[in-house]
């Protein structure tokens, strides 16, 4: 008894020891916020340009203890108004305007060591760029401030004046030039008020040598940068009457540019529309047409990629698509630009290597092409495993396949099979010496005891000796009160199964069509319910899974095609009717957290959330 008790306790204790302690906690927890703070601070520190990102809200969090504490986090961020180079933290920044602010979602795993130390183990952020300000041609509010395009020509005199103003009023040793205009606004008054935000970059021109910017002054990638916001008033005579400027300069840290690695003789990618490819492509298509034994010329349709390599000359490696044209080789001496592509012609995928020796004026092209195949239609019969290997049997010119035999496809399949069309079909089956066992469709041997009155033999879809109700071709043994009658006068004769089997079925059957259908369905369900019954297809091959490039039209779907799938009767309160989930459903009512700050005056504790789920009220509207 003690041994049983110990085993019982061990069986209850071992599963709890093997499971990792993981639980969902409140997104507004203080430790969760510290973990997100560490993750967001690390992300902002890795960016060197633009503005910092500010926390919007925490959406998911889970804590794992094994043995250290790990937080699995998912949080949303928005672009703030503080540059990365500023000394502010993300908590001191405000959100940027919604139309101009980038957004993102981050997934991070943060470890907690000790009581206060948080370290980021892994983090991935997906950033969505801002849509930018909406620029319209007309505004309903005359005299209101409205955004304008950053590429507007009206900004050129204002920006030119602003750059000159900055260079004349700063003590920096070098001149600065405009880098990027970020946003601009304008207001129509007695003239125009402009407000422009832009970035500047240090150039290679020092103030000792240059008093103003010249075309020789170029921006330095490793120089200082800055961001300015200017306000200017332009009067009706297009003169700048007032101007104010506020700039933040960000000195670059000591940085040594690593030497670029030179690879002499390595292939370098070139644009597919480069003019340098005209000569190699012309030699490639000429080589293709000379070696191809087709009756029509080919021309290049699309260039996929191209590289050039410096060897003893130049080596071009080009991948392109060539298509057959309407110009025949018999009536045209060479390919011309007037030759149009034949949309129904052959398509080739080509790899070309062209060696160009400029000093010898020689070109050595090599072209290797393969015809492009079309997507094949896969067909799998009911109950056939998708993991079974398929061998595609190809013939010259096309792929020969046959569809699986079903209740609606024997006539079409037999007509497409030329080997079976010639000569009479002997026996009661689809092939000599083969026996088909398919219960439920009248194929194969089947015994059924019934309360019928006689011994019926009916002709139908079945072939071979079959004993059943319905459309079976053969004998059916029944135990009843009447005499045994043999109504199958044609039984024992050789039939071609392509003959109108429905007509013979109706002539030999003494029951109504409704009774026949009812008995057939009853037989189908009972036969499918028998255990250990094998379903075999004597003429089925793996190639039946592959359809031809130009498949024949299949007959329309009818209700008899659904006889492959039995109707399983289930009670509403049975276990088969109710689905039992493998794992308990988890809910997280404590997430997402409240927004960190209000967005455009929205209360952070109350947020309107759009729901795209289906509502029953929608069906009543």
Curated annotation (Swiss-Prot):
Subcellular location: Secreted, Extracellular space
Coiled-coil residue windows: none
Primary localisation category: secreted
Region (Disordered): 396-497
Positions bearing Phosphoserine: 331
UniProt key word Protein biosynthesis: no
SUPFAM superfamilies: Cystatin/monellin (SSF54403)
Signal peptide feature range: 1-18
One GO CC annotation: extracellular region
Processing and modification events after translation: Bradykinin is released from kininogen by plasma kallikrein. Phosphorylated by FAM20C in the extracellular medium.
Its job: Kininogens are inhibitors of thiol proteases. HMW-kininogen plays an important role in blood coagulation by helping to position optimally prekallikrein and factor XI next to factor XII; HMW-kininogen inhibits the thrombin- and plasmin-induced aggregation of thrombocytes. LMW-kininogen inhibits the aggregation of thrombocytes. LMW-kininogen is in contrast to HMW-kininogen not involved in blood clotting.
Name of protein: Kininogen-1
Species: Bos taurus
